[in-house]
Amino acid sequence: MSRRHAAEKREVLPDAKFGDRVLTKFMNNLMIDGKKSVAERIVYNAFDRVESKIKRAPVEVFHEALDNVKPSVEVRSRRVGGATYQVPVEVRPERREALAIRWLITAARGRNENTMEERLAGELLDAVQSRGTAVKKREDTHKMAEANKAFSHYRW
């Protein structure tokens, strides 16, 4: 690993259909083996399903679902004198977004519907209504942070 300087962050281009950068990040995370066109097709078809189910703009629904999954606090392990404490820390905005995207995709992949489009649409609809696996993951993370509040003075 180079010690000279950190690699600069590359700008993510907005997606073709909706012109949304966050949606592009979502597609990039969903993509397997560099098959971006497949990821795009899955997302756009899932959006069509969402739009037909609840008559709202799919990008609006996507952002609302993402907001419902974003964690505000998480726990980090901190070793103090031979003991490891789970210290609650606030989550940076970029990481919030990244975690929400990752959790939504993982939850969608774990569902029982037939196609990935159906799974993704189902998970997005659940997340908008504050249910589903991704939202549960966020709640669990918050509970963990709440339970370990006593160790918050170990924050760094």
Swiss-Prot record:
The keyword Membrane does not apply. InterPro entries: Ribosomal_uS7, Ribosomal_uS7_bac/org-type, Ribosomal_uS7_CS, Ribosomal_uS7_dom, Ribosomal_uS7_dom_sf. The keyword Repeat does not apply. Keywords: Ribonucleoprotein, Ribosomal protein, RNA-binding, rRNA-binding, tRNA-binding. Transmembrane segments: none annotated. GO terms for cellular component: small ribosomal subunit. It holds the Pfam family Ribosomal_S7. One of its GO terms (molecular function) is tRNA binding. One of its GO terms (biological process) is translation. One of the primary rRNA binding proteins, it binds directly to 16S rRNA where it nucleates assembly of the head domain of the 30S subunit. Is located at the subunit interface close to the decoding center, probably blocks exit of the E-site tRNA. Belongs to the universal ribosomal protein uS7 family. Part of the 30S ribosomal subunit. Contacts proteins S9 and S11. This is Small ribosomal subunit protein uS7. It comes from Ruegeria sp. (strain TM1040) (Silicibacter sp.). The lineage of its organism: Bacteria, Pseudomonadati, Pseudomonadota, Alphaproteobacteria, Rhodobacterales. The gene is rpsG.
